Structure formats: C-alpha cells, structure tokens
C-alpha cells in the first residue's frame, strides 16, 4: 500500500534566512512535515519601522503579500516601540503575522533595548542593521546571529528571538475552538 505524505506549504514574506529558519523550526514542531520558503515581498512600511502600528502593519502586509500556493504565510517585522522607564525610551520587538487566506493571528517576541547611540542613529533615519553592523564589525548581522546575540553575549540569538513571535502567533491556531477559528 502506498503511503501518502502530507506536508504543509508555508511562505515567509522575506528572503532573510533567519526568519525562514525560525518559522521552519516552530512550524516543524507543530505540524511535522513542512516546506517553508522565503518569498521577497514589500512590507509597505519604512525599512526601519517605529511604533506598534507601523511594525504590526509591516508584518501583516508581508503575510498577506506572501500568501500564494501555500496553506499559511508568515510576515515578520521588527521595530522600535516607545516604552517608558527604559534607558533610551525604546524597545525592539519582532511581530509575526500568520495568514491562512482568511484569518490573521499575531504574536510578539521578547523585547530588548538597543544601546543609546544605536537608537539615536535610528531616530535620525538610519536602519538598526546598518548601525549594528558598524558597531559589531559583522556584515549583515541581522541575517545571521542578530543584534540580540551580540548584546546578550550569545545567550539568545536572532533565530531564537524570532521563534518566540512565530510561536506566539500560532497559539490561536493551536487552540482554534478557544479563538473561534475553523
């Protein structure tokens, strides 16, 4: 008897290997056999989002725009968010939007604060990635271990941080009856 192998096709609205790997890691644990591929799409927000609305909109746009020939699409967007009582006034959070053609579910990662000089440069119009590349001497740090790895002394890398937001966005899908999903 021939066995049928089921696998889920998932598109990630980015060519960033960290975002693709994090999505594959989390959805592989949940669904087993997944095919995850990166699809370059426009976020529709500035390259360096600032604020909740802009960052979430970027993640949602990426998820919706990547939805083609797949069961789920994923959009991940990192941005600075105003947070009182922090040294710089800002915390970096990654938002994940997961789209199934009907519903969007959202999740967010643990946040961390960039050094003041990084935030100052970003607020002056530069991208975090460019500033962190200069600070660390690592080209395309955000496509590798990430700023969070550098700043945490390697205790958490960008893949792990990104996995957090993907998993949080999956919670309603893992409990569909509790969230009114099909």
Swiss-Prot record:
Binds 1 divalent metal cation per subunit; can use either Mg(2+) or Mn(2+). Its EC number is 3.6.1.73. GO terms for biological process: nucleotide metabolic process; thiamine metabolic process. Keywords: Hydrolase, Magnesium, Manganese, Metal-binding, Nucleotide metabolism, Nucleotide-binding. Mg(2+) binds at residues 42, 69. It is an enzyme of class 3 (hydrolase). Its cofactor is Mg(2+); Mn(2+). Pfam families: NTPase_I-T. One of its GO terms (molecular function) is ribonucleoside triphosphate phosphatase activity. InterPro entries: ITPase-like_fam, Non_canon_purine_NTPase, NTPase/PRRC1, YjjX_NTPase. Transmembrane segments: none annotated. It catalyses: XTP + H2O = XDP + phosphate + H(+); ITP + H2O = IDP + phosphate + H(+). NCBIfam families: inosine/xanthosine triphosphatase, PRK03941.1. Homodimer. Phosphatase that hydrolyzes non-canonical purine nucleotides such as XTP and ITP to their respective diphosphate derivatives. Probably excludes non-canonical purines from DNA/RNA precursor pool, thus preventing their incorporation into DNA/RNA and avoiding chromosomal lesions. HAMAP family: Non_canon_purine_NTPase_YjjX. Belongs to the YjjX NTPase family. This is Probable inosine/xanthosine triphosphatase. It comes from Methanothermobacter thermautotrophicus (strain ATCC 29096 / DSM 1053 / JCM 10044 / NBRC 100330 / Delta H).
